[in-house]
Amino acid sequence: MMPSWKSESFSRAAGGVAVCMAVGLAVARADETAEFSGPRAFAHLQKICDLGPRPSGSAAMVTQRAMLVEYFRAAGGTVSGQAFTIRDPRTGNAVHMENLLVEWHPDRPERVLIGAHYDTRPFPDRDPVDPKGTFVGANDGASGVALLMELARGMPALATPVGVDFVLFDGEEYVFSQRDPYFLGSTYFARQYAAGQQTRPPQAVRYRYGVIVDMVADRDLGIWQEQRSVTWPDTAPVVDAIWAVAARRGVRQFVPRPKYTIDDDHVPLRMIGRIPTCDIIDFDYPHWHTTQDLPEQCAGESLEAVGGVLLEWLRGQR
């Protein structure tokens, strides 16, 4: 991120039980009354970070993708991949990327999209000491994925007429200079979705709302309302509803005022895909794009604050 459909060509993403077992990720039984567990979510974050940096096209990204495919299938989701290819902005060589779609209750045509990027920036370019060093991306990369992994426990038993899709975007920040484009995966997804909406019958899949979760594990969490999300007339009600849930739950980390204008995956989803999508993000994170974006800067309590609010909001969809 930077401050301020379902395609018919989806390919089945590769995955293996051995990969899932190797990283020690267990899937809990679905439970209609299950509450979001911060410790479980943090364990997912740690296991993802144990893979090391996960930039698009890397071996660690391929391993992570296989792990996630197996995890979400075991949790009861219908998982598919949306593959696309871009050119490396430095060399012109092909880089293969893939968004992951996890469908819950695919028979329900009215749907909500919950998205997060699962790639990491190639380098910690804001690090004052080593801007070409190792970037693990615990908060900026792993936190949104870990949140969706724990949120999956409550999805099979979701007793609403609305289905839910998790979308894990590749290529959110495959960026080597300020000239390089961001949001490659969400832009591709939005274009495919928009094209499909023009040709499909009225009863086809339609996204009622979208929510992006990004950088949601900071130990000192503060989720201010993102400026675009409260300014766009079709996304402002989504923000109001989510922050109202936070207020009812007494989750003080959700601040009911706007602060930053942030370019993130919600922008192409809304501007290209016409999906009313808001951004849930803590942009007051001192370790952003540095070598210190590590699990020790994150907390399960923060993941639980955000995940618990989202789970209750989803359960309230009618």
Task: Go through each PLM region and give its residues.
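Active-site-adjacent substrate-binding region
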Residues: 60, 81-83, 87, 209, ...
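Structural recognition of the beta-strand scaffold that forms the well-ordered cores
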Residues: 101, 111-115, 165-168, 208-214, ...
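Acidic/histidine-rich catalytic neighborhood of metal-dependent amide-processing enzymes
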Residues: 132-234, 265-266
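Stable alpha-helical elements in mature extracytoplasmic
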Residues: 37-47, 60, 64-71, 141-147, ...
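Second-shell loop/turn segments in exported
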Residues: 31-35, 49-62, 86-91, 130-141, ...
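Bacterial N-terminal signal peptides
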Residues: 14-24
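A non-catalytic alpha/beta surface segment that caps or lines the substrate-entry region
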Residues: 34, 43-107
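N-terminal secretory signal peptides that target proteins for export/translocation
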Residues: 1-10
